[in-house]
From Swiss-Prot:
It comes from the Bacteria. GO terms for cellular component: plasma membrane. It is found in: Cell membrane. The lineage of its organism: Bacteria, Bacillati, Actinomycetota, Actinomycetes, Kitasatosporales. The keyword Oxidoreductase does not apply. InterPro entries: Gly_transporter. This is UPF0126 membrane protein SCO5481. Its main location: membrane. Coiled coil: none annotated. The chain crosses the membrane at residues 10-30, 34-54, 66-86, 93-113, 120-140, 158-178. It is a multi-pass membrane protein.
Length: 219
C-alpha cells in the first residue's frame, strides 16, 4: 500500500507538518482581516483540515482522520496561539506566509493522491483528489475571509498548477511502479518550488482569448 511508503510515525509527522503550515497561513490571513481569537482558530482549522475532510468523505474513509486523531485538531490550535501572540513579528514577514502555504501545498497534494489510490480510485481520480486535498482548505479559507479564492483569479500567481504537477508526478510514479519515499519527496519539492517560482516571477494562467490583459477585476 502506497500510504505505507513511510513508517506510521513518519507519515503522521508529515501529516501534522502539512496541517501546521496550512493553519499558519489561515491564521495569518485571519489576523489581517481583524478576526477575533475564535475567528483565527476557525480559519486555521478550516484551512488545515478542509481539503483532507473532503477527500476522506469522497473516498469513504469515515470517520475522517481529522475526527479520530486529536493531534489533527490540536495542531491548528497551536498555530492559532503562535500567530495570536506573535503576529506583529510574523506579519512583517510576507514571504513567510507564502513559504508556509507553498509547503502545505506540496505535502498535501502528494498525501492526498496516495491515500485516494490506496482506497481504490483510479490514477486520474486520485490525482484530482490530491489537487483537492491541497487547495480545498485554501479555497475555504478565502471564502470565509470574503475573498475570491486565489486559484480562480487571473490576477493571482499560479496556485493550483503546482499542486496539479505534484499530484500528476505521484500518479505517474504509481503507474510505472516507481513511487518511493524519494520520488514522493521529489513531488513535494517540485510543487513547493513551482509555487515559489510563480510568486517570484508572477506566473499566471491565461485568461479567455482576446481578453485585454490591462483589465483586472476589482479586488
Amino acid at each position: 500500500m502506497y500510504e505505507q511508503l513511510f513508517s506510521p510515525t513518519v507519515q503522521h509527522t508529515l501529516d501534522l507538518v502539512g496541517i501546521f503550515v496550512f493553519a499558519i497561513s489561515g491564521a495569518l490571513l485571519a489576523v489581517r482581516k481583524n478576526f477575533d481569537v475564535f475567528g483565527i482558530a476557525v480559519l486555521a482549522e478550516v484551512t488545515a483540515l478542509g481539503g483532507g475532510l473532503f477527500r476522506d468523505l469522497v473516498i469513504g474513509a469515515v470517520p475522517p482522520a481529522a475526527f479520530t486523531d486529536l493531534g489533527y485538531f490540536l495542531t491548528p490550535l497551536l498555530a492559532t496561539l503562535l500567530v495570536f501572540f506573535l503576529h506583529p513579528h510574523v506579519e512583517r514577514l510576507q514571504t513567510g506566509v507564502n513559504i508556509f502555504d507553498a509547503a502545505g501545498l506540496g505535502l498535501f497534494c502528494v498525501a492526498g493522491t496516495t491515500k485516494a489510490y490506496d482506497y481504490g480510485l483510479g490514477l486520474t481520480a486520485s490525482a484530482c483528489l490530491g489537487l483537492t486535498t491541497a487547495v480545498g482548505g485554501g479555497v475555504l479559507r478565502d471564502v470565509l475571509a470574503n475573498e475570491v479564492p486565489s486559484l480562480l483569479r487571473w490576477d493571482r500567481d499560479l496556485y493550483a498548477v503546482p499542486a496539479i504537477v505534484g499530484s500528476a508526478m505521484v500518479a505517474l510514479c504509481i503507474r510505472y511502479e516507481a513511487l518511493t519515499p524519494f520520488t514522493s519527496g521529489l513531488a513535494v519539492v517540485t510543487a513547493f518550488v513551482l509555487r515559489l517560482l510563480a510568486l517570484r516571477f508572477h506566473w499566471r494562467a491565461p485568461r479567455a482569448w482576446n481578453r485585454r490583459s490591462t483589465v483586472v477585476e476589482g479586488d
